Amino acid sequence: MPAAISRNWPAPAKLNLFLHINGRRADGYHELQTLFQFIDCCDMLDFKVTETPELILHSNMSGVVADSDNLILRAAKSLQQTTGFNGGAEIWLDKRLPMGGGLGGGSSDAATTLVALNKLWHTQLSTEELAKIGLKLGADIPVFIHGFAAFAEGVGERLQAVNPGEPWYLVIAPDAHVSTADVFQDPLLPRDTPKLAIDTLMSQPWANDCQKLVVSKYPQVAKALGWLLEYAPSRMTGTGACVFGEFTQQQQALAALAKLPSEMQGFVAQGMNLSPLITRLSHP
């Protein structure tokens, strides 16, 4: 009897509510302090367990990423190799989040793949073990696996659960591809923000240390942020290009969205301190 398809596994976007760069390590990675929060805008994945070990990915974004580089397939293969599971999976991705942009979509897709297949394959790894697999694939993946809003330190792997407010956001995705590697290699990037205690960071105004550099190099980001600042406290997420404005009421965010210039793309979403992936995990 063929296996049923397990449907509607969410892979939410994240915002970096602040991002501070505290220095550069000997290995070239940067020491960070950042605050991750999920938003209720998600890619969706479906999974079917197969008896043969092949991993097959169907996507509405076919051709964008080579199979060998696709984080979803790499995550599934890593779980196979770690656990010795000898079956496979057929995976369907409904890509709804902007590619790149600092929303973490690729990392979130990989995290959802690890969490879902660990359940469907009955491989029974702990959350910590899944996060270790995820960290090898990308620094942002563990936060999506743990599934709670988090203060992160180090290269982003040391996580502490936090409960910031859950406001409404207007997110704008400028038509620009910002290379994370280029941002972190740029000599003009500030790398000397003092490390602060979490209580201090949570109570002071929030900022993104990458923002000034990216805005200076990408006029589309500068334009989107300039427009958004007319309506709400706003900043960039990650290394961009996406920017977000913070609103207390959904209606305020929707009213601003209605005025968005036609050449800009945006959407309204609510902050979430618990990932919808965790809610989905508790269902059959």
From Swiss-Prot:
One matching Pfam family: GHMP_kinases_N
InterPro entries membership: GHMP_kinase_C_dom, GHMP_kinase_C_sf, GHMP_kinase_N_dom, IspE, Ribosomal_Su5_D2-typ_SF, Ribsml_uS5_D2-typ_fold_subgr
Keywords per UniProt: ATP-binding, Isoprene biosynthesis, Kinase, Nucleotide-binding, Transferase
Coiled-coil annotated residue ranges, if any: none
Lineage: superkingdom: Bacteria
Gene Ontology molecular functions: 4-(cytidine 5'-diphospho)-2-C-methyl-D-erythritol kinase activity; ATP binding
Catalytic activity reported: 4-CDP-2-C-methyl-D-erythritol + ATP = 4-CDP-2-C-methyl-D-erythritol 2-phosphate + ADP + H(+)
Pathway where this protein functions: Isoprenoid biosynthesis; isopentenyl diphosphate biosynthesis via DXP pathway; isopentenyl diphosphate from 1-deoxy-D-xylulose 5-phosphate: step 3/6
Family: Belongs to the GHMP kinase family. IspE subfamily.
NCBIfam families: ispE
Role description: Catalyzes the phosphorylation of the position 2 hydroxy group of 4-diphosphocytidyl-2C-methyl-D-erythritol.
HAMAP family, alphabetized: IspE (MF_00061)
Protein name, per record: 4-diphosphocytidyl-2-C-methyl-D-erythritol kinase
Species assigned in the record: Shewanella baltica (strain OS185)
